[in-house]
């Protein structure tokens, strides 16, 4: 059975967003708040924001309104005692490595947008439409129950999605030029 849009879980999976007050964290919140599979049960951020209501701690930048139920949530510290089975991490790379590892050691599945674990040989660098088989790497991770999965940076995601259809044609070289906006 494939998990298409018709698939329904009996119970939603409880999730937490780490780094929830930043722009990437806000995007995670926006995507998860009405998701059919996930129940956003906690938001976590820096010590500066923890203890505050999310609505007070965040400068909401998303085009959709912040749901009142989420705005009333108390921002938790980024420690692995927050509720949830999956941690969607939008943490800055300067702190993500240690915190994400702590969450994985505590049994969470960590889905990271940070670059901290991108070069770890046992962490899948996943673009599901291109390399879903890369998930097999999680079997080699040292955590008894938790795991870490990450994505490549935004330029690489677009590039791999564009180049994947060319693989059967045996294109051997692609010249890519990336320019950073400022």
Please provide the spans of the model-predicted regions.
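N-terminal Rossmann-like NAD(P) cofactor-binding subdomain of oxidoreductases
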Residues: 1-182
């Amino acid at each position: 059975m494939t998990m298409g849009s018709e698939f329904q879980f009996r119970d939603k999976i409880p999730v937490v967003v780490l780094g929830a007050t930043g722009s990437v964290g806000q995007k995670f919140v926006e995507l998860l708040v009405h998701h059919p599979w996930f129940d956003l049960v906690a938001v976590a951020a820096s010590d500066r924001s923890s203890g505050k209501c999310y609505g007070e701690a965040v400068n909401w930048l998303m085009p959709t309104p912040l749901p009142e139920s989420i705005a009333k949530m108390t921002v938790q510290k980024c420690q692995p005692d927050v509720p949830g089975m999956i941690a969607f991490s939008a943490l800055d790379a300067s702190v993500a490595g240690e915190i994400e590892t702590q969450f994985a050691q505590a049994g969470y599945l960590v889905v990271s947008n940070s670059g901290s674990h991108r070069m770890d040989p046992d962490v899948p660098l996943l673009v599901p439409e291109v390399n879903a088989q890369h998930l097999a790497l999680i079997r080699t991770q040292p955590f008894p129950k938790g795991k870490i999965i990450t994505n490549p940076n935004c330029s690489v995601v677009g590039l791999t999605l564009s180049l994947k259809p060319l693989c059967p044609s045996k294109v051997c070289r692609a010249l890519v030029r990336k320019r950073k906006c400022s």
